Amino acid sequence: MINPVTNTQGVSPINTKYAEHVVKNIYPEIKHDYFNESPNIYDKKYISGITRGVAELKQEEFVNEKARRFSYMKTMYSVCPEAFEPISRNEASTPEGSWLTVISGKRPMGQFSVDSLYNPDLHALCELPDICCKIFPKENNDFLYIVVVYRNDSPLGEQRANRFIELYNIKRDIMQELNYELPELKAVKSEMIIAREMGEIFSYMPGEIDSYMKYINNKLSKIE
């Protein structure tokens, strides 16, 4: 069962050169063992040191880049609208598109992945007003972390973020129950069960959700 950490009110920026401090600032309940490990190949883009616990932030790659990204995000930021309209799935098909549609007020919740907890976009996002993140490691992957970004100034924000995590866990449970099936068949069957509601909480257009469900159905019929 996934139990993500949440920064409920956003976080305040901290002035530090130490890599450990910035991660704990956005992910306070991360296991201590994480900092005893050597930086992975993706971490090394942003930090330098023998272990994450003694590593320092790289000035250009993390500090300056985070400042640039935060400045960009502030120009794109909008207060929460009274009502949200459906968006095209294509608008949120990239990590930037996913969080940009949230901070610009187009939808209350989105999801993307990062390959390092030192990703400057992640840290910049967490400092925006009324923008919150739930972070948890992707299962069976040594690098990826899933980030659920949502509007804290909309009741739909955390509600949909929590429902995403519930659906994510449902899909994982189904995959485990179907462990005797081929990997592709497990993936498609579990997707069939959660896909429509997942599309709805991501605010995708109803027609696009219908098209995706038809695609999944066709894919299932070809596999079975």
UniProtKB/Swiss-Prot annotation:
Keyword terms, alphabetized: Host nucleus, Methyltransferase, S-adenosyl-L-methionine, Secreted, Toxin, Transferase, Virulence
Main location: secreted
Cellular compartments annotated: Secreted; Host nucleus
Gene Ontology BP terms: methylation
Reactions catalysed according to its record: L-cysteinyl-[protein] + S-adenosyl-L-methionine = S-methyl-L-cysteinyl-[protein] + S-adenosyl-L-homocysteine + H(+)
Region of interest: Interaction with host proteins TAB2, TAB3 and ZRANB3: 49-52
Listed EC numbers: 2.1.1.-
Domain of life: Bacteria
Molecular function in Gene Ontology: methyltransferase activity; toxin activity
Residues bound to S-adenosyl-L-methionine: A92, S98, R107, Q111, Y204, E208
Oligomer status and interactors: Monomer.
NCBIfam families: NleE_fam_methyl
Family: Belongs to the NleE/OspZ family.
Protein name: Cysteine S-methyltransferase NleE
Organism this protein belongs to: Escherichia coli O157:H7
Gene label: nleE
